[in-house]
């Protein structure tokens, strides 16, 4: 029986290509996305997303000066473990070829991914986005949160890797010394790019007419508090990540103790060796042959620190989600209290 794969794979980065008007030396300062693309991403999750399962797809468009225009997208199909012959690169090329035949923008400009309660900061996302930005400098990743969107407000954010993190990933130096030298922390890993949703004039007129026809039965319903399930789940995920961080700290502390202990043993061995050679010299004996101390005392392998940074970044996301949720509810409570006092 076929079983679904876990959502750990990420879209494969395309070969480098640029569009007319692209300026590789200037960063992307704004993203303009068509409303149709947003609807396609939402539809993709509603059709194939199940709970915490992640859906992914490719973004197409072009670059105009410092603005990235996303005009179309297509999803990656959910394949099972039995689909060993599925080739993601071949699938992307066939889709782009089909879009080119119907005169639709077919240049890669990034990829999108859904998230479960803001859980998107991971090594898989980092590696995939690095591949995209390394091939096409203007590439972005769009993160769509269906949980927040279902509560009444569209949650769609665009991220890019910072130049510091790009250099670290190129050098592949994820040690504590390398990260310290680059002066990079979890707050300097991703940079958010502002998004502007663009619709045609006819769609704007239609939305204006629909807004005029829509009536709110009870305006006080807007003051209803959000469900506590969202807060409970966010706190649970936050505690899980704090536990992961605690385990990483224990591993690094163990490595530091072992390294210090080995350095002490190495120093003691060197001193004993020098004393013994001094005694042999006073007795007129030949000194002991020199030995490679570094081979005798091999330093322990340092644990990579990039995973710790990713965990810290995810903890920060959960904290921001909790802060946003509680601030909205507190605002509603104060507004309800003011209205109640005014009516009484």
Curated annotation (Swiss-Prot):
Its main location: cytoplasm. Signal peptide: none annotated. The keyword 4Fe-4S does not apply. Pfam families: eIF3h_C (PF19445), JAB (PF01398). GO terms for molecular function: metallopeptidase activity; translation initiation factor activity. One of its GO terms (cellular component) is eukaryotic translation initiation factor 3 complex. Residues 8-23, 261-272 have a biased composition (Low complexity). It is found in: Cytoplasm. Keywords: Cytoplasm, Initiation factor, Protein biosynthesis. GO terms for biological process: formation of cytoplasmic translation initiation complex; translational initiation. Residues 1-24, 256-305 are annotated as: Disordered. Residues 31-165 form the MPN domain. InterPro entries: eIF3h, eIF3h_C, JAMM/MPN+_dom, JAMM_MPN+_peptidase_M67A, MPN. It comes from the Eukaryota. Component of the eukaryotic translation initiation factor 3 (eIF-3) complex, which is composed of 13 subunits: eif3a, eif3b, eif3c, eif3d, eif3e, eif3f, eif3g, eif3h, eif3i, eif3j, eif3k, eif3l and eif3m. Component of the eukaryotic translation initiation factor 3 (eIF-3) complex, which is involved in protein synthesis of a specialized repertoire of mRNAs and, together with other initiation factors, stimulates binding of mRNA and methionyl-tRNAi to the 40S ribosome. The eIF-3 complex specifically targets and initiates translation of a subset of mRNAs involved in cell proliferation. Belongs to the eIF-3 subunit H family. This is Eukaryotic translation initiation factor 3 subunit H. It comes from Salmo salar.
């Amino acid at each position: 029986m076929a079983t679904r794969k876990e959502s750990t794979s990420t879209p494969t980065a395309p070969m480098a290509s640029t569009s007319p008007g692209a300026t590789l030396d200037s960063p992307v300062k704004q993203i303009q996305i068509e409303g149709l693309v947003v609807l396609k991403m939402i539809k993709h999750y509603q059709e194939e997303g199940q709970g915490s399962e992640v859906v992914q797809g490719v973004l197409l468009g072009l670059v105009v000066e410092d603005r990235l225009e996303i005009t179309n997208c297509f999803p990656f199909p959910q394949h099972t473990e039995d689909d060993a012959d599925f080739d993601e690169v071949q699938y992307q090329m066939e889709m782009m070829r089909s879009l080119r035949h119907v005169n639709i923008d077919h240049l890669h400009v990034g990829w999108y991914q859904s998230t479960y309660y803001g859980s998107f900061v991971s090594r898989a996302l980092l590696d995939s986005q690095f591949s995209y930005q390394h091939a096409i400098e203007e590439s972005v990743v769009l993160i769509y949160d269906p949980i927040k969107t279902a509560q009444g407000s569209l949650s769609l954010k665009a991220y890019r890797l910072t130049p510091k993190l790009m250099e670290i990933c190129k050098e592949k130096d994820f040690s504590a010394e390398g990260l310290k030298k680059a002066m990079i922390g979890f707050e300097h890993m991703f940079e958010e790019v502002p998004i502007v949703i663009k619709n045609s004039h006819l769609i704007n007129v239609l939305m204006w007419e629909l807004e005029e026809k829509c009536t709110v039965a009870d305006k006080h319903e807007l003051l209803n508090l959000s469900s506590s399930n969202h807060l409970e789940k966010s706190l649970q995920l936050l505690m899980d990540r704090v536990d992961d961080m605690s385990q990483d700290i224990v591993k690094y502390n163990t490595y530091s103790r072992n390294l210090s202990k080995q350095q002490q043993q190495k120093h003691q061995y060197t001193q004993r060796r020098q004393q013994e050679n001094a005694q042999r010299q006073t007795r007129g004996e030949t000194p002991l042959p020199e030995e490679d101390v570094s081979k005798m005392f091999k330093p322990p392998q340092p644990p990579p620190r990039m995973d710790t940074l990713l965990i810290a970044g995810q903890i920060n996301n959960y904290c921001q989600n909790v802060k946003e949720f509680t601030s909205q509810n507190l605002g509603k409570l104060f507004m309800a209290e003011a209205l109640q006092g005014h009516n009484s």
